[in-house]
């Protein structure tokens, strides 16, 4: 199943507005940006994969833990792989830790933001998929699997900018 769906990239407002034809005519969910690795796992196998669609050896123990608590569903869980204390301005260190071939990463967790039920790619609105993700995170019930909170939903670039400024005023990205 992994080759069916292309990896979706997050849009960053300041980069999008610099484009000749910015894609700003849709409704978007707003999340705070953190320094993490894009990852996904497919149910029922529960093997954590990177953007390059490779298994990540440094989080094998987390894959095994999730597999032991997996709900009886089929689909793809999409998330950022994070390490406590490495969320802001420490991507290069996080990258080195997650690139390890034999040593397990410590204090690793997943910030879940999407779930594609039954591998029905691109047939369901993002907010409905997020509601499925919420249910899956609750059913897994592990502190290492966390829901990434939505800060807002809007199709108004002024609201996006106001949210970005609010986050930046608190030291976020």
Region locations from a protein language model:
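Charged, flexible boundary elements
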Residues: 1-25, 30
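Covalent nucleotidyltransferase
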Residues: 20-143
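Short, basic, glycine/proline-bearing loop/turn elements
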Residues: 1, 139-151
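Short, motif-level signal for alpha-helix interfacial/capping segments enriched in acidic residues
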Residues: 14-18, 91-94, 155-161
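Amphipathic alpha-helical
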Residues: 150-173
């Amino acid at each position: 199943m992994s080759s069916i769906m292309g990896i979706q990239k997050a849009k960053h407002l300041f980069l999008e507005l610099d484009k000749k034809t910015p894609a700003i005519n849709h409704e978007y969910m707003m999340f705070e940006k953190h320094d993490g690795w894009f990852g996904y796992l497919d149910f029922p196998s529960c093997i954590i994969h990177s953007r390059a669609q490779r298994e990540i050896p440094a989080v094998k123990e987390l894959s095994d833990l999730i597999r032991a608590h997996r709900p009886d569903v089929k689909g793809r869980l999409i998330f950022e792989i994070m390490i406590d204390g490495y969320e802001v301005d420490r991507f290069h260190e996080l990258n080195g830790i997650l690139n390890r071939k034999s040593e397990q990463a410590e204090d690793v967790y997943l910030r879940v933001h999407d779930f594609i039920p039954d591998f029905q790619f691109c047939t369901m609105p993002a907010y409905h998929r997020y509601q499925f993700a919420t249910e899956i995170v609750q059913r897994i019930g592990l502190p290492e699997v966390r829901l990434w909170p939505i800060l807002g939903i809007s199709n108004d670039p002024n609201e996006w900018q106001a949210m970005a400024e609010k986050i930046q005023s608190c030291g976020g990205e």
